[in-house]
């Protein structure tokens, strides 16, 4: 007898699956749908910028070189046609590479747009299958709804549960959210989605080793793609009839709670249900490609840049104090040698030094030709001390505030002091109206780095400027617009 038949599923799994199957995003939140539209284009634009990096592109393409799947899943900005598992990895890798996509900060951190790669790959795959069976493909409004659900699952689990404190990387939540939602997109039944989701929880999960000194490295650029591709794989296995594990969380000795969490179950103190909260409150990286806990510090530094210059720059500075949150201290307060771009974009002292010296921060500043050759950066880093501001940390976790504050105080050698503080970064919901035109420009600028023809770029711009047309476009037509091989094909 199969004992699994008699087992009751862990409630956490049932709640996720019931939300994925039953919640009507479009009917509940216009704001969430509009924000998802912004997030989709912002993430694809980040991917276009990622394609400029050979570190990223060397990891992309089919697993077996020079193979192509006719009618396969496409990868924006390229001519690849891949199986959906490979496509999810490719899209996830390019979207995440420059650390410029959106962000969610709570007890756990992460980037909910990492789920988009799994959603797009699964949606194009099932839509191609639907067409072959004279069924309708998924529409882009279906993609936006799927995004909202992935964001919500990842973000709500992150609110009160810290995976980083037990050494696990936040991409575990990408795998979990993407598995539930992509299995649903593929047409999975409730039991099939439960089966897939349980396998996502009991999978091996990456450590945070590659995000911290002395081992910070490029895996943090492809970790999300890896999680997304695994989610698609687990979903496809469930669709093929693979079994699940009802008490994968609560089982004595071998369950997730015992193995990873000292038998403590997940907490849902801030939000006990899933809706559209996370998408509505998502944090966009509007201007600066750097770890999000440092975004307001960059803004402060750029505000202080003219004073820094007028006072004489590096040699005029006695010391600099950055007041920040406890998570920022834990993640991006770094001293000593920074070995690569991945190390530098996660160093608060580095990004502030660059912003003070140059009055801006770009991805190019992380490369060796700037970071190593311009010795002013490391000399200024040595003058910076980071300390926790307890009120900043409290407001960071306060659900009514959710601030990500930083302040910078510069003490000059002549005794003069200048301080600037910013509580909410430009990508915060509190500054959404200020951010929207900048997000639009960020996406349009990303098109300049692509190989699209001018007519194709005009077509993409037209789609971006017409959300109503976008909503009723099929995923297949959408991917045609963004595919190099057929980017010029007009869409009726």
From Swiss-Prot:
Top EC category: lyase
Domain of life of the native organism: Eukaryota
EC code: 4.2.1.79
Gene3D superfamilies: 2-methylcitrate dehydratase PrpD
Family recorded in the similarity comment: Belongs to the PrpD family.
Annotated Pfam families: MmgE_PrpD_C, MmgE_PrpD_N
GO MF annotation terms: 2 iron, 2 sulfur cluster binding; 2-methylcitrate dehydratase activity
Chain's gene name: prpD
Protein name: Probable 2-methylcitrate dehydratase
InterPro entries attached to this UniProt entry: 2Me_IsoCit_deHydtase_PrpD (IPR012705), MmgE/PrpD_sf (IPR036148), MmgE/PrpD_sf_1 (IPR042183), MmgE/PrpD_sf_2 (IPR042188), MmgE_PrpD (IPR005656), MmgE_PrpD_C (IPR045337), MmgE_PrpD_N (IPR045336)
Pathway of action: Organic acid metabolism; propanoate degradation
Keyword Lyase set for record: yes
GO BP terms in the entry: propionate metabolic process, methylcitrate cycle
Task of the protein: Catalyzes the stereospecific dehydration of (2S,3S)-2-methylcitrate (2-MC) to yield the cis isomer of 2-methyl-aconitate.
Entry keywords, A to Z: Lyase
Catalytic activity: (2S,3S)-2-methylcitrate = 2-methyl-cis-aconitate + H2O
């Amino acid at each position: 007898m199969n004992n699994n038949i008699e087992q009751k599923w862990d409630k956490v799994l049932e709640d996720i699956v019931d939300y994925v199957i039953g919640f009507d995003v479009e009917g509940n939140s216009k704001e969430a749908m509009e924000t998802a539209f912004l997030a989709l284009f912002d993430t694809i634009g980040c991917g276009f910028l990622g394609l400029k990096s050979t570190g990223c592109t060397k990891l992309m393409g089919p697993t077996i070189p020079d193979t192509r799947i006719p009618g396969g899943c496409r990868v924006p900005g390229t001519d690849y046609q891949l199986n959906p598992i490979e496509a999810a990895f490719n899209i996830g890798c390019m979207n995440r590479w420059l650390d410029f996509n959106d962000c969610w900060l709570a007890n756990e951190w992460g980037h909910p747009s990492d789920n988009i790669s799994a959603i797009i790959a699964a949606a194009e795959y099932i839509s191609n299958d639907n067409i072959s069976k004279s069924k309708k493909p998924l529409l882009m409004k279906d993609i936006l709804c799927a995004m909202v659900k992935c964001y919500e699952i990842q973000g709500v689990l992150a609110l009160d549960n810290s995976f980083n404190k037990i050494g696990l990387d936040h991409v575990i939540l990408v795998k979990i959210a993407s598995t539930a939602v992509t299995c649903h997109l593929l047409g999975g039944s409730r039991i099939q989605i439960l089966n897939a989701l349980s396998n996502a929880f009991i999978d091996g999960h990456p450590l945070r080793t590659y995000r911290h000194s002395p081992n910070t490295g490029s895996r943090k650029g492809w970790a999300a793609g890896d999680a997304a591709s695994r989610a698609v794989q687990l979903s496809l296995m469930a669709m093929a009839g693979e079994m699940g594990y009802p008490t994968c969380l609560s089982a004595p000795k071998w369950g997730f709670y015992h193995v990873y969490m000292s038998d403590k179950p997940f907490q849902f103190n801030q939000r006990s249900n899933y809706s559209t909260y996370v998408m509505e409150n998502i944090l966009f990286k509007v201007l600066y490609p750097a770890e999000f806990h440092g975004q307001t510090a960059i803004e402060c530094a750029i505000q202080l840049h003219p004073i820094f210059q007028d006072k004489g720059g590096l040699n005029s500075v006695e010391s600099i104090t950055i007041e920040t949150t406890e998570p920022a201290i834990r993640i991006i307060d770094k001293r000593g040698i920074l070995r690569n771009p991945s190390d530098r974009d996660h160093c608060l002292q580095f990004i502030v030094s660059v912003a003070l010296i140059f009055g801006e921060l770009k991805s190019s500043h992380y490369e060796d030709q700037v970071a190593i050759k311009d010795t002013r950066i490391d000399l200024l880093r040595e003058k910076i001390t980071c300390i926790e501001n307890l009120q900043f940390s409290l407001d960071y976790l306060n659900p009514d505030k959710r601030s990500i504050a930083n302040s910078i105080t510069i003490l000059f050698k002549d005794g003069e002091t200048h301080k600037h503080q910013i509580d909410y970064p430009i990508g915060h919901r509190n500054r959404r109206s200020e951010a929207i035109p900048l997000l639009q420009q960020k996406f349009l600028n990303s098109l300049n780095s692509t190989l699209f023809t001018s007519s194709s770029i005009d077509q993409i711009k037209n789609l971006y400027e017409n959300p109503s047309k976008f909503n009723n476009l099929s995923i297949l037509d959408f991917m045609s617009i963004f595919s190099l091989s057929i980017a010029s094909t007009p869409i009726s």
